[in-house]
Amino acid sequence: MTSKSSPLIFERSREGRYAYSLPKSDIKTNSVESLLDDKFIRKNKAEFPEVAELDLVRHYTELSNKNFGVDNGFYPLGSCTMKYNPKINEKVARIPGFSESHPLQDEDQVQGSLEIIYSLQEELKEITGMDEVTLQPAAGAHGEWTALMIFKAYHENNGEGHRDEVIVPDSAHGTNPASASFAGFKSVTVKSNERGEVNIDDLKRVVNENTAAIMLTNPNTLGIFEKNIMEIREIVHNAGGLLYYDGANLNAIMDKVRPGDMGFDAVHLNLHKTFTGPHGGGGPGSGPVGVVKELASYLPKPMVIKDGDKFKYDNDIKNSIGRVKPFYGNFGIYLRAYTYIRTMGATGLKEVSEAAVLNANYIKARLSKHFEIPYKQYCKHEFVLSGVRQKEFGVRTLDMAKRLLDFGVHPPTIYFPLNVEEGMMIEPTETESKETLDYFIDTLISIAEEAKNDPDKVLEAPHTTVIDRLDEATAARKPILKFENLKQEK
């Protein structure tokens, strides 16, 4: 690996330099020693970087210019819905009445904020076909876990605590079995059929008296709609299990079909995907959970309800699993999502899904002559191609993904789902123009030609990025996580 990266802020530090200074305080202060127990007081001076203001500004401006995001390039990261985030969302989120409020304020002082929470709950109920919605979970996987804990409490409350198995398709998100494990369940895999859908015969084989639930994404991670969903519902419900909907792919079906109408008992949504909350960099996210009326009494508390012409917190939820997030979740994301939903309206959301599906099928059709497409039918919002043809020339999907970086395109998701060899999962979203799609398609076709005629160019990519090929094995086995370790390495 070679690096053209900037120095760390700590490496720019010079003793005695400072960015700004404050006047001496005329307020009486107390020493740290008088306020804290000895065990909380540092023995050595904290090693904060000492830099001038100009150096500080240049450092972070330089780093920001090296970042890649939806605002400066195409980001077809499959199963992540990297759509453009409208800037009006940011303006609304910065309205002082919202941005300067505090979750510990009295209800009477934050009626506007509570109304936003309540109204967003109502909008999401309509979109999903669920009877009740909580906004508390902070991310998709957190929403998965919350729903599974509701399922667990429901089964235990009905004298069926022995139900400890959750069925997960072999094409599922990795978070599904992980969330099941965190919730105390065992994961049982159900295989896909030749069309990429749940194998009904295999489902009948694995379902039993210990089945607590099945976790499904529809359309699934291959971008294929599970057309047998009503039969799946009947099989699982007849066995006493529940149906969980992973909302990662809701962008494909808004105002077309609702999870509740398909027979799902609970659903989580990703406000940071489908509803344009910004994501990447670790957060913040938001993973609301909706449930049918039979599960409503198990939702986390508090809920926000409307009482006459006022809004208030409701802690009187009989079988509640308790809080799953301090206060009431990531409120700033609610504002962005609510703004998006109200801006688009039902017709606009329907057009979003139509455009997302059209874009994915356009790319798939144009690439089908140059790459292996394991599932030939029309896809929904995303699809998976395979790099097995290019592998014949010694070039793998990883190499092609690295080469895309040289063309200013973020690589799609690779090697996922696991049941596609040399897989590359592409999700263009609805916000990209035909010109952008054509550029991406032409770029991938040119890389496929390079793989055949000049494989070394692909194998040595990327050529233009700040960081070249990472030594991923060493990075995983011997990570440098602290600055002092970096100094030792040097």
Curated annotation (Swiss-Prot):
Keyword flag Protein biosynthesis: no
SUPFAM superfamilies: PLP-dependent transferases
GO cellular component: cytosol; glycine cleavage complex
Gene3D superfamilies recorded: 6.20.440.10, Aspartate Aminotransferase, domain 1, Type I PLP-dependent aspartate aminotransferase-like (Major domain)
GO aspect biological process, one term: glycine decarboxylation via glycine cleavage system
Pfam families: Aminotran_5 (PF00266), GcvP2_C (PF21478)
Top EC group: oxidoreductase
Cofactors: pyridoxal 5'-phosphate
Keywords tagged on the record: Oxidoreductase, Pyridoxal phosphate
GO molecular function: glycine binding; glycine dehydrogenase (decarboxylating) activity; pyridoxal phosphate binding
Enzyme Commission code(s) on record: 1.4.4.2
Catalytic activity: N(6)-[(R)-lipoyl]-L-lysyl-[glycine-cleavage complex H protein] + glycine + H(+) = N(6)-[(R)-S(8)-aminomethyldihydrolipoyl]-L-lysyl-[glycine-cleavage complex H protein] + CO2
Residues where N6-(pyridoxal phosphate)lysine is found: 273
InterPro entries on file: Aminotrans_V_dom, GcvPB, GDC-P_C, GDC_P, PyrdxlP-dep_Trfase, PyrdxlP-dep_Trfase_major, PyrdxlP-dep_Trfase_small
Role, per record: The glycine cleavage system catalyzes the degradation of glycine. The P protein binds the alpha-amino group of glycine through its pyridoxal phosphate cofactor; CO(2) is released and the remaining methylamine moiety is then transferred to the lipoamide cofactor of the H protein.
Summary of subunit composition and partner proteins: The glycine cleavage system is composed of four proteins: P, T, L and H. In this organism, the P 'protein' is a heterodimer of two subunits.
Similarity section: Belongs to the GcvP family. C-terminal subunit subfamily.
The protein's name: Probable glycine dehydrogenase (decarboxylating) subunit 2
Organism for this UniProt entry: Staphylococcus aureus (strain Newman)
